[in-house]
Amino acid sequence: MKAVIVIPARLKSTRLPEKMLVDLDGKPLVVRTYEQAKKSRLASDVLLAVDSKRLLDIAESFGCKAVLTPENLQSGTDRIAFAAKSIDADVVINVQGDEPLIPPEMIDSAILPFIENAALPCATLIQPIVSDVPEILQNPNVVKVVTDKNGYALYFSRSPIPYQRNSDAQPKIFRHIGLYAFRKPALETFTTLPPSMLEETERLEQLRLLENGIRIKCVITNLDSQAVDTADDLAKVKAILAKKLK
């Protein structure tokens, strides 16, 4: 089985302008993400899927493999699907371009289920929510997930799930980590499906898979990463990276 990591990277970003090119100790943020992904033991290769010639040229100047994709694609998943057409891969892993500290072990944990199950269409990562702080459970930016007994997703929501009507019950509550792995046919199928009702309601594209009967294996991880969405996130990453590079 051949697994390839594809990292979607857009030059334009709203909260942190051109964040993919922000300097992190002499290298652009997206290059740091690429280098972390290269440390995966189970992936055969890594490819950047970029939306501009400028980003392509900069990535290649640092030795990154990259492919230019149309600027107007609707989502990161559409971008990796476009890039995946040109690569030889059985499984395609979507690692976000703004994850310069992502542990390679997180990536490998999403690949492993495909080795164990040749029919698996899709996998993603989830993490236990160990705090009952309302600011976490009620935060719509923290996506919650419930699974069946075999670890397959039943539903993803921005609302707290499951709703705890029985105060004696002690359900495990999980948050979704936005790293996906697709068997290539499932990825191709996803991009041909129209946006679904639940997807548009919650603004969560993974619900398109569930509504169309495509199962998602949820892998529990206790590892952490730090995405860069804001200036505060960037400051955290710079501080962590400075310690690592000492």
Swiss-Prot record:
One Pfam family per UniProt: CTP_transf_3
Location(s) in or outside the cell: Cytoplasm
Domain of life: Bacteria
Principal place of residence: cytoplasm
Residues spanning the signal sequence: none
GO cellular component, one term: cytosol
Biological-process GO terms, alphabetical: CMP-keto-3-deoxy-D-manno-octulosonic acid biosynthetic process; lipopolysaccharide biosynthetic process
Molecular-function GO term, any one: 3-deoxy-manno-octulosonate cytidylyltransferase activity
The protein's annotated pathway: Nucleotide-sugar biosynthesis; CMP-3-deoxy-D-manno-octulosonate biosynthesis; CMP-3-deoxy-D-manno-octulosonate from 3-deoxy-D-manno-octulosonate and CTP: step 1/1; Bacterial outer membrane biogenesis; lipopolysaccharide biosynthesis
Catalytic activity: 3-deoxy-alpha-D-manno-oct-2-ulosonate + CTP = CMP-3-deoxy-beta-D-manno-octulosonate + diphosphate
Function recorded in the entry: Activates KDO (a required 8-carbon sugar) for incorporation into bacterial lipopolysaccharide in Gram-negative bacteria.
NCBIfam families, alphabetized: kdsB, PRK05450.1-3, PRK05450.1-5, PRK13368.1
Family: Belongs to the KdsB family.
Name this polypeptide is given: 3-deoxy-manno-octulosonate cytidylyltransferase
Source species of the chain: Chloroherpeton thalassium (strain ATCC 35110 / GB-78)
